[in-house]
């Protein structure tokens, strides 16, 4: 077929060259955005008198027809037409005649594709924010059901201090809240229009960029045409924000994988989110959590790939920028899928409160409580730390725990020890006493839950 840009050429490209350079296999995902962008563009052209109202109306009717066909997956794209833009333009001309060729007046594929991606990411970021809020709602429900579920808190993957399981869950709620805030802030950069920037230098036609931006729901326009067509910061920012979100999901999945093991037995995954072994009949594998952990690397790769593509590109457009889309599409699909699976996995998991409780009583995670006890009686904390360290050594040598040590032994270490010492050794009491702002104390958890519920309700309303 003859190319829409073929006037300057005397030889046709080999079929394999056409296939290598074509992007329609993946950029067809922008079909709705491309058509909507064209409808706004031709509406602006008519307003400015660049095309007649009759011509614009005919073009819009043709575009609306193609949009309906696209929604029903009835459009047949061709590699020969290269990309989504030329495919749509070719179909439009076939549908309404040569007047369809006027659609591209005052526009280049460079600003056209940038506009498509801005529209696409605006929609997808809002979807991801909503899905993240739904996951946060699941976390709030689990936290509400586990305020008084006591578990070991860890540092270096060693038992450190008793905490509420709700407190642990809410840590991820606040990580996700930052993720939502990052996505929301990125919309300021996504929601601006490059349409009308042309190939790189603007256009000689008297277009109204602000009007077409308004029609598409953008908050403003790029102030520099070179920047408009060469900018991919908004995609990089999306990929970066998504990488951070996936890192948070991956960290949580790592813990879920550990907790579901026989060594921990803190939780049990629902059968819906686990698989078995083809050879070992006893196995129940946390495959969904492992997949989310694994797919995190995939999202990282998409970010690093585009950063590498962009680092050496001179202004303005270069064909290298065709490589900006597949990683973006893949990240959207991956993040949306992981958020959905994560919400279902957490909603259906069973918490083994008894095992968590056993873990926190058969360890030395209450050692800090004794140090704080001595410090509250006036002993410098460093001296208290030394005394408790010796007590722990004594216990490990005897094969006992701090709660088993008789008061006489405590008094040999320090005269400040009294009978009330045993009250602070209870894991429940240890958690309850940590009532500083943001701490694991039950009162603080209740306050945190109120804030969290307010944030999720507000998001649902919006």
UniProtKB/Swiss-Prot annotation:
Pathway: Amino-acid biosynthesis; L-arginine biosynthesis; L-arginine from L-ornithine and carbamoyl phosphate: step 3/3
Domain of life: Bacteria
Compartments, record wording: Cytoplasm
Alphabetical keyword list: Amino-acid biosynthesis, Arginine biosynthesis, Cytoplasm, Lyase
Entry's Gene Ontology BP terms: arginine biosynthetic process via ornithine; L-arginine biosynthetic process
Pfam families: ASL_C2, Lyase_1
Name of the molecule in the record: Argininosuccinate lyase
Lineage: Bacteria, Bacillati, Bacillota, Bacilli, Bacillales
Gene, per the UniProt record: argH
